[in-house]
Structure formats: C-alpha cells, structure tokens
Amino acid sequence: MRGWRFPDPTPGNSPIPLLTSAAQAVVMASPRLRYGRYSRTGNVYVLTTVTVRREPLFADAANVAVLVDALRFVERAGISHSLAWVVMPDHVHWLMELQMGTLAECMSLLKSRSSRLLNQQLGRRGALWQHGYHDHTVRSDESLHEKAMYILANPVRAGLACEVGEYPHAWCRWPL
C-alpha cells in the first residue's frame, strides 16, 4: 500500500522497531495517524479544528463574526465551496468542497487569516488554533444533506441549543 510502511520481520533489518504490545502500537502509530491524508479538488470534506487549550473564544459573537469572515474569504478566494458550518465555543466543524489546492493549504489560509484578525481584534499575540485538524472525506454514498444536519446538530448535542436551526453560529446551504 502506498503511504504505509510495514516493518521487515527479520530482526535488525527494519528501521521501524517491531511492536511487542497493542499499547506500544497505539503510542508508536499516533504520530503518523494522518500520514495518509489525501486531498483532491472536487471532493467534499468534513473538517474540524480546535482552539489552543480549547479556549472558548467563540462564545463571543464578535469573535464568531471574524471566523465566519475568514470562512467566506477562503470561499471567495476560490479554494472552497462551503456547504455547512457550525462554530462551537472552542472549535469549528466545516462541510466543504475543495475547489483548488490542498486541504493543508485551505486550512492554513483559514487558520492564518482568522488568527491574524482575531489576535488584532483581541489585542493579543500567539497561536489561536491547535496544530493540525481532523478531516473526513465524504464518500459518494453518503448524503451531503445528512452530513450537514449532523454538523448543525452539534450545538444540540452539546446542550447549547434545544433544536437544530436555533443556534445562531451555524449556517447551511440547504433549508433546514
């Protein structure tokens, strides 16, 4: 398989040490969990990124407005086509179609623009987002509308809203 390295079973011949326990496998594999990340224009992704120390910066509507502006900036730049998003107090979920470039470039632009503008607005410096992000490629047999509804239901599951559509910091391309 491309992107994966399997150890040579002959002792001493592998640059990757052989695993001796399941716990060791988890610890050793974790730095490469997203090694196989693959981005392709035209694919739809669910992306999640979290603030440093899970700081609830987006409990403030003014900060949410800055992040929403950054999401729209990435779309206006032709990099993404947003289908749905929800801004939770300490993270964002984003359903989008990649239009140009890579996921890494897309997320880098979103994070750098929102960080710069938010730090300026808050009169602070430093990292706003944790390193990395979680991505899920939406398969062709998965319903985009169902994915969007799942994302929009996050505030309900977190106890921030009673029903989908009530939370003010969410948006969807389709009617609810």
What are these regions (language model features)?
Residues 1-176:
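Short catalytic/metal-binding and nucleic-acid-binding patches
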